[in-house]
C-alpha cells in the first residue's frame, strides 16, 4: 500500500497518509462504510446523484463539528440530486449520538472504523493516528471524481467557497 509521508500535518507535525492519491477525472473508488444503524453502505448506492464526500478526523473535535454543521446547513439547499456524506473513523454509535445532539439531519454520516475502506481507497488514512485526514471530494452522478481538496493542516477547515464553486460546475 502506498504511503505519502508529510502529505498533511497536525499542528505543524508531518503525518503519513496511507493509500494512493486519487485524481480528478478518474472513476471514484467504491468503498463500504457503516451507517448509524451498523448497515454497510457503498458509494455506488448513490450512483445517479452527485456526492460530496467530506472526510474528517472525528466529529467530537471542534473543527470537525463546525465543518459538518456547515455542510448540513448547505445540504438542505442542494436539492434531491446531491448527497453529502461525512465520513470519519468514529464508531457508528458515536456518530448517531453526535448527529442527534448537533441536530444534523440533512447529510449522512458514515463510519470507516471497521476496514478503513474509504480511507485507503481515497488515500486519506493517517497512519500514525488511524484517523482520516480532512478532505473533500465531489463525485458526479456517473461515478467520476470531479473535485478533490486535501486540507494540508488537519486542524484547519476546508475552503468551502472552492467546494461550492466546484459543485456548480458538476451539478
Positions of the model-derived regions?
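Chalcogenol-based redox active-site neighborhoods
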Residues: 1-171
Amino acid at each position: 500500500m502506498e504511503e505519502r509521508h508529510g502529505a498533511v500535518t497536525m499542528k505543524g507535525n508531518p503525518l503519513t497518509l496511507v493509500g494512493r492519491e486519487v485524481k480528478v477525472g478518474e472513476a471514484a473508488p467504491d468503498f463500504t462504510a457503516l451507517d448509524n444503524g451498523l448497515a454497510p453502505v457503498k458509494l455506488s448506492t448513490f450512483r445517479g446523484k452527485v456526492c460530496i464526500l467530506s472526510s474528517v478526523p472525528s466529529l467530537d473535535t471542534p473543527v470537525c463539528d463546525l465543518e459538518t454543521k456547515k455542510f448540513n446547513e448547505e445540504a438542505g439547499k442542494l436539492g434531491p440530486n446531491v448527497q453529502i456524506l461525512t465520513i470519519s473513523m468514529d464508531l457508528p454509535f458515536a456518530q448517531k449520538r453526535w448527529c442527534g445532539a448537533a441536530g444534523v439531519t440533512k447529510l449522512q454520516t458514515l463510519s470507516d472504523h471497521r476496514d478503513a475502506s474509504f480511507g485507503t481507497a481515497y488515500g486519506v488514512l493517517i497512519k500514525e493516528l488511524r484517523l482520516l485526514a480532512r478532505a473533500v471530494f465531489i463525485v458526479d452522478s456517473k461515478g467520476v471524481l470531479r473535485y478533490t481538496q486535501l486540507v494540508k493542516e488537519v486542524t484547519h477547515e476546508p475552503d468551502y467557497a472552492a467546494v461550492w464553486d466546484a459543485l456548480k460546475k458538476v451539478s
